[in-house]
Amino acid sequence: MNYKLIANYIGNILRIEGLFMIPALLVSLYHNEFKCVLAFGISIAALLVIGQLMYMIKPKKRNIFVREGFAIVSLSWLAISLFGALPFFISREIPNFIDCFFETVSGFTTTGSSILSNVEALSKGLLYWRSFSHWLGGMGVLVFLLAVVPNGKDNDAQSLYILRAESPGPTFGKLVSKMRQTAQILYIIYIALTIIEIILLFAGGMPLFDSVLNSFATAGTGGFGIKNASIGAYDSYYLQGVIAVFMLLFGVNFNIYYLLLARDFKLVFKNEELRFYIITVLMSVTVIAINIRSMFSSWFDAFHHSFFQVSSIITTTGFSTTDFSLWPELSRYILVVLMLMGACAGSTGGGLKVSRVLILFKALRNEMQRVVHPRSVKVLRIDGKVQNEALVRNVSMYLVAYVIVMIASTLLVSIDDFSFTTNVTAVISCMNNIGPGIDIVGPMGNFSGFSWFSKLVLSADMIIGRLEIFPVLALFSPSLWKRCN
């Protein structure tokens, strides 16, 4: 293990986080929030000084392999969450550091779970930092580092280990030959979609500050609301419709947008994950709308709220226009299934990912056919390409690890003596980076009632879910920390 290289990378990440806090400081300054200006000033100084000291640790070798990639990604996410919590704590707007840490982890992992009962009481600068953390975490902080910091020829291929460890989904490949160019393309698409959404929301009458922050949360599929009633506070079909559409767009694999820009429409239409994603959304919206029709004054309202909540849950954004905890059992069951499945691989969304579900369905179908026809030879194809058994095995092992972590976490948080539904959906929402669960942690509730221990467990679940389990679990493997000769 190259410890100096890990320290060097984390130091660079902390310096970048310090620079990213400057806009939040300026927002606080503009609104005369001098307590928050001081909090951000101290936090920025700490990040820049500590980050620079760590960055000055120069490794003899800059080779990044799987072990270094896992360690850099996992420890970087822990570090940015700890330091990102400082403005909340120093300003005393959230007096308990565990709560500050929970809120910040929820922001960077794009979960959107909150301990705040009155978010509108938070200062503008902290609201900005809270939502901006969604935007930074959506594409990945280390992806940004790869996009803007030259790595050199020798380290370009090795940067793939970092990108694979941080990017969601069972597989990740380069869009172009250079790793840095791949990261730049991803961020250009990400920024462009964010700007378009800001313009559309502002054009629809949403205040500019709200448009920017809601777009940050949508882009990262995070769901931190800046109103107590979430998006339901904006009584506008247009604004809610724009956000619903963009939630779905950010839940699509970003490779699709690159293919569209390259005019490779054949590969887009051939993409099975995209088709499965669209069909799942359409079917879920229709069934839920029929199921909740009696709760609304018209079919239009039923379809509107159904479309918004399906978009929000499947992309793991977590915005809400109404309290879906009060919906009939069938609708709530469908939403829980969508929570588990999540968005497409290579998107900013969380969950198991559509591609994994698709692979598991196809593997199950092939296995059933082998039972009926033992001598038959079945291969698993995705987008017309034959997939090897290793991919199926990896997806299966991921599912096993996911279930084990989910069961263990549910047992740990159950000591707070909340209902089974509250405990399970709290863990599911945190592991899948969704935000709201059902019952006490529903869209109109929050996580403040959990003990400090449960909040730490749920914070760990958020990071585990965002980094897709194995990079975090690898930290507890003694072999990861052995020195290389």
Question: Predicted regions span which residues?
Answer:
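Membrane-proximal intracellular helices of multi-pass ion channels
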Residues: 1-485
